[in-house]
Amino acid sequence: MSEAPKKRWYVVQAFSGFEGRVAQSLREHIKMHGMEEYFGEVLVPTEEVVEMRAGQRRKSERKFFPGYVLVQMIMNDESWHLVRSVPRVMGFIGGTSDRPAPISDKEADAILNRLEKASEAPRPRTMYEVGEVVRVNEGPFADFNGTVEEVDYEKSRLKVSVSIFGRATPVELEFGQVEKLD
């Protein structure tokens, strides 16, 4: 008695910007061809990010791997052809063109854990670190450079030490009022 093959995770390259549509089309193709037994999840790994725009907190989604869709599947000729027949699919990543290699269980677990963490709390679009130098681009301290002393991601605010007349002055600013220096 042989064991049924295990579904493994494969990385499918899609046209950039069409990952969601490719995932949806793939799900529809699987149903249409009655191949549900060969496929598990079809994912476009994203995280919710928060950014300040015009003084407003805005939530948006950022893709972990732009241009890629993760597909849990049993690889055989039929499932391979089904994935390749979906519009805007460029191919599989890893292995050879006719025999793709799955990602390791360790890599798959790392991605799935990252997805779980991302669903818990939205992250800011821009990450700031204590000690980092930023430029103030709004308000009375516009065009001054300062050093980040504290970061409050909950409120999207920073405490920045700005040098005014040779003295370091702590200033509370919103994320949208500063920009990172390269």
Swiss-Prot record:
Q: Which UniProt keywords apply?
A: Transcription, Transcription antitermination, Transcription regulation, Transcription termination
PROSITE patterns assigned: NUSG (PS01014)
- Extract the CDD domains matched here: KOW_NusG, NGN_Bact_1
Instruction: Tell me the ranges covered by the KOW domain, including all copies.
Output: 130-161
Alphabetized Pfam families for the sequence: KOW, NusG
Task: Give the source's domain of life in one word.
Answer: Bacteria
Gene3D superfamilies on file: 2.30.30.30, NusG, N-terminal domain
One term under GO cellular component: cytosol
| Purpose of the protein | Participates in transcription elongation, termination and antitermination.
Q: Which HAMAP family match?
A: NusG
- State the NCBIfam families in the record: nusG
The record's PANTHER family line, in alphabetical order, gives: RHO-INTERACTING TRANSCRIPTION TERMINATION FACTOR NUSG, TRANSCRIPTION TERMINATION_ANTITERMINATION PROTEIN NUSG
Protein name, please? Transcription termination/antitermination protein NusG
Q: Coding gene?
A: nusG
